C-alpha cells in the first residue's frame, strides 16, 4: 500500500487522477482504514472491488437517513465473509441506531469449501452457511448477499439452492437486493 500511495501521488501530479487504486481487500488485510469516499474519484474500478465497501457504507447511510422512523420488531441474520465482518458491523450500526427494535445478527462465516484463507462473502457456499448458521438464533429471516449466489439463480457455488438452505435451517432465506436502499428494505422487512 505504501508503494501504491507513492505512485498515486505521482499520477495525481501528472494526470490529475490517482489512476491506480488498490482493492478494498488490501486495506482489510493490512488493517488500514479504507480511504474516504472522495478518494475513489468516480469509482472507475468498483466492479473489481475497488471502493465497493466505502460506496456501500455511503449509500447505506443515505438509505437509512432517507427511511422514515418507525417501530420495527424484527430479527434477521446476515451471513458474511470473515474478511468484511468488522466493516459490515459498522455499516449495519446505521440501521441499528435508527431502528432500536431491529436486531441484525451479522455472522462471520468461515469458508471450509475453498479454505480458510478465502474470506470474501461472494465465495461462501450453502454448506458453509449451514455449518455456521445452525448454531445461531436466526430470527425471522436469513438475508443473503447477492454475490453469494449465481447471477440469475438462487443457487450457491456448491449447487445448494436457497430453498434447500431454508429447509435445512428452518428459517426463510432470501437474496437481498443489490442496491443499498433495497438492502435496507430487505432488512426492515418492507421490500416489495
Language-model features, listed with the residues they occupy:
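A glycine-rich phosphate-binding loop feature that marks nucleotide/adenosyl-phosphate handling sites
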Residues: 17-30
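Single conserved hydrophobic/aromatic residue that forms the stacking wall/gate
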Residues: 1-13
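Generic secretory/membrane-interface signal
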Residues: 2-4, 18, 152
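Short secondary-structure junction motifs
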Residues: 15-17, 101
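Radical SAM enzyme core and accessory elements
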Residues: 30-192
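Acidic side chains
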Residues: 2-5, 24, 140
Amino acid at each position: 500500500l505504501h508503494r501504491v500511495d507513492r505512485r498515486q501521488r505521482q499520477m495525481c501530479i501528472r494526470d490529475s487522477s490517482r489512476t491506480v487504486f488498490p482493492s478494498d481487500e488490501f486495506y482489510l488485510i493490512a488493517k488500514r482504514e479504507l480511504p474516504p469516499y472522495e478518494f475513489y474519484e468516480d469509482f472507475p474500478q468498483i466492479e473489481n472491488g475497488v471502493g465497493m465497501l466505502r460506496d456501500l457504507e455511503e449509500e447505506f447511510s443515505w438509505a437509512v437517513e432517507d427511511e422514515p422512523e418507525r417501530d420495527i420488531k424484527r430479527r434477521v441474520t446476515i451471513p458474511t465473509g470473515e474478511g468484511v465482518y468488522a466493516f459490515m458491523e459498522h455499516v449495519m450500526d446505521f440501521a441499528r441506531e435508527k431502528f432500536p427494535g431491529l436486531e441484525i445478527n451479522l455472522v462471520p462465516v468461515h469458508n471450509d469449501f475453498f479454505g480458510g484463507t478465502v474470506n470474501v462473502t461472494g465465495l461462501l457456499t450453502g454448506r458453509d452457511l449451514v455449518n455456521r448458521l445452525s448454531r445461531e438464533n436466526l430470527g425471522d429471516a436469513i438475508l443473503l448477499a447477492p454475490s453469494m449466489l449465481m447471477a440469475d439463480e438462487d443457487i450457491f457455488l456448491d449447487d445448494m439452492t436457497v430453498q434447500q438452505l431454508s429447509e435445512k435451517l428452518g428459517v426463510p432465506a432470501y437474496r437481498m437486493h443489490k442496491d443499498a436502499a433495497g438492502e435496507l428494505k430487505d432488512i426492515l422487512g418492507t421490500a416489495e
